[in-house]
């Protein structure tokens, strides 16, 4: 209801420099997202920090728009593909469904929930997925792995449920200034995690080493550039983190 009203209001606002590829908004008002702290500034964490990037009309984030821009250029026909969407971003999920993608949504919450557009979400643990091997063409899990202690098991499960040559987008906040990951201690409190990892519910801060570490599980791990034809108000320097089975 709220974003529906904002979408209507957005059509009346003056045109702005940025465009939302998920809802078509091209207005002058964008909303704040994220938080700022010493760790984010110190490590220049990509995908974190306080910024004015959320679409006024639909609420999509800069990351949502980045991922969709990549997918729409990568995939000619969504209707023939099956996606697993982990902790699904509402507007991205809604857009993919509108293009005919066969979406399966999961979240680790204790009880399932429905999005406003009626898509059922299954309660599931990424380290123990309730799906047969080689089930999905694509997996999308954005800003999920930094919350999971047993990262290797989660990566194994993602690889297991992907079809041969299947792909996954696994966006994470990471520091280009760190050569290795910083792993949080189990006894760290929220304040320590916020100060040392950038967010109070993260279990690690990724450094550039993740590219090599993930190569132990996936055939291909790479950072993919996204060249948008219009200015989508994206996070400066953020690229798609793409893996392939």
Residue ranges and their predicted role:
Residues 81, 133-135, 166:
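Surface-exposed loop/turn positions
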């Amino acid at each position: 209801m709220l974003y529906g009203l904002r979408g209507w209001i957005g059509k009346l606002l003056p045109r702005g420099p940025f465009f939302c590829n998920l809802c078509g908004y091209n207005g002058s008002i964008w909303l704040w997202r994220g938080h700022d702290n010493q760790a984010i500034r110190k490590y220049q964490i990509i995908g974190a920090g306080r910024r004015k990037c959320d679409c006024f009309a639909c609420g999509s984030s800069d990351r949502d728009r980045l991922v969709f821009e990549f997918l729409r250029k990568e995939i000619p026909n969504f209707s023939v593909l099956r996606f697993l969407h982990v902790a699904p971003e509402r507007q991205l999920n809604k857009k993919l469904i509108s293009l005919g993608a066969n979406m399966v949504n999961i979240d680790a919450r204790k009880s399932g929930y429905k999005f406003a557009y009626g898509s059922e979400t299954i309660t599931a643990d990424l380290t123990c997925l309730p799906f047969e091997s080689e089930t999905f063409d694509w997996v999308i899990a954005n800003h999920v792995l930094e919350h999971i202690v047993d990262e290797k098991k989660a990566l194994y499960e993602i690889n297991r449920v992907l079809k041969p040559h299947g792909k996954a987008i696994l966006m994470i906040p990471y520091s280009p200034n760190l050569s290795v990951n910083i792993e949080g201690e189990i006894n760290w409190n929220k304040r320590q995690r916020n100060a040392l990892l950038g967010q109070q519910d993260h279990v690690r801060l990724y450094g550039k080493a993740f590219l090599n570490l993930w190569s132990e599980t996936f055939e291909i791990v790479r950072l993919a550039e996204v060249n948008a034809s219009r200015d989508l108000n994206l996070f400066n320097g953020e690229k798609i983190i793409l893996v392939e089975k």
